[in-house]
UniProtKB/Swiss-Prot annotation:
This is UPF0735 ACT domain-containing protein SH1278. Belongs to the UPF0735 family. SUPFAM superfamilies: ACT-like. The lineage of its organism: Bacteria, Bacillati, Bacillota, Bacilli, Bacillales. InterPro entries: ACT-like_dom_sf, ACT_dom, UPF0735_ACT_dom-cont. It comes from Staphylococcus haemolyticus (strain JCSC1435). Transmembrane segments: none annotated. Residues 74-149 form the ACT domain.
Amino acid sequence: MDNNDYKKFYLIREDVLPESVVKTLKIKDALKNNPELSIYEAVKLFDLSRSAFYKYRETIFPVDEKMLDHREFTLILYVNDIVGMLAQVLNTVSKLQLSVLTIHQSVPMEEKATITLSLSAKDTTISIDEIIKALRNIEHVSKVELISMSM
């Protein structure tokens, strides 16, 4: 592949996307869920110009959509330094049918630590959002962030 053809990818939160990009995602979802809906009808329904839809439709996609092919990603968990914390996290990972590729737990400072997990979700259909929510629901986990993903 020529270096001029390479396009960089970014993970970006939905709430900071321009309205036209968010509408494009909604239109793509509507078209996927209703094969009888035409592009003309869909852009009217979501009040977006066809030119804006065509501009963004091949450049924006939900993280989970790309994860279907390559289901490897890395998360960082911010946790309280509690005995058995890592075991609780790994138990949840196991219940979600995820495979651990790499794991690193930082040295605790001020009773806080981080756990970095590289995971494979090839044996499950659960979405990345559901995985993050499940890990956030563990007692003493204060934050979970997606920091990388294979594409």
